A protein has these predicted regions:
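N-terminal beta1-alpha1 ligand-phosphate binding loop
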Residues: 7-28, 183-184
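Short acidic low-complexity segments
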Residues: 31-42
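Short, Asp-centered acidic motifs that coordinate Mg2+ and/or phosphate
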Residues: 45
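Cysteine-nucleophile active-site neighborhood
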Residues: 52-121
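Pocket-forming structural segment of enzyme catalytic cores
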Residues: 90-164
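Beta-strand-turn-beta hairpins that frame and shape the catalytic cleft
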Residues: 137, 172-177
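Short, surface-exposed beta-strand/loop micro-motifs that present aromatic residues
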Residues: 165-172
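Acyltransferase
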Residues: 176-205
Length: 205
């Protein structure tokens, strides 16, 4: 029997995480929901979920951002989903408060006539994205009014276009992956994707 892997979902205190837990559940995974970020970083994989607002989440992490950034730099595997991806950056126009700052850049509001960006949209992968847990996911479900702006394109694995705004929809730095969409709401393809990403991250530990 294979060793059980510990996955910790950090709960910002913003809402129901049931659909995410269901999407990533497996017999060889021990999934916990943690409200203490320092406890969450002891898991094999840390998951930053997509439920909540930047300001409240930054406040929930207050005092632990530096510890988390250090843990990520030391190789802690991490998956950030929607808001969780945005928290990997330094700051957001949405609210005051510091992000983790692991990926250089910031978060800005979409400058389009239709905000928020809701529903299914395409994902445009760069060729070098192969081997990053990508099982050819081409469309996914989005629900975002803010997007991540990297200092350069090196962390970006995929882009998505909403009206005339093209933004990073998948980023990776070391063992940390962020996705702007909600894989747990993206049907079977999304669930296959998020589980492939987690398996990829587990091998990095």
């Amino acid at each position: 029997m294979s060793e059980s892997r510990r996955l910790a979902i950090f709960d910002y205190g913003a809402g129901n995480l049931h659909s995410l837990v269901k999407a990533i559940s497996a017999d060889d995974r021990d999934i916990s929901i943690e409200t203490d970020l320092r406890v969450a970083t002891k898991a094999d994989v840390l998951v930053l979920p997509g439920v909540g607002a930047f300001g409240a989440a930054a406040n929930a992490m207050r005092g632990a951002q530096a510890d988390l950034s250090s843990a990520l730099a030391d190789g802690l595997p991490c998956l950030g989903i929607c808001l969780g991806m945005q928290l990997l950056f330094e700051a957001s126009e949405e609210a005051p408060g510091k992000g983790i700052g692991f990926i250089p850049g910031s978060v800005a509001r979409l400058r389009t006539s239709k905000v928020p960006h809701m529903g299914w949209n395409s994902i445009e992968w760069r060729e070098s994205a192969n081997g990053n847990g990508n099982p050819e996911l081409r469309t996914a479900y989005f629900a975002n009014a803010y997007v991540c702006q990297t200092e350069d394109d090196s962390p970006v694995l995929a882009w998505t276009t909403h009206q005339d705004a093209k933004f990073a929809s998948v980023v990776r730095s070391a063992n940390t992956i962020g996705v702007q969409f909600h894989p747990e709401k993206s049907s079977f393809g999304g669930r296959d994707f998020v589980n492939a990403v987690i398996e990829d991250l587990i091998t990095c530990r």
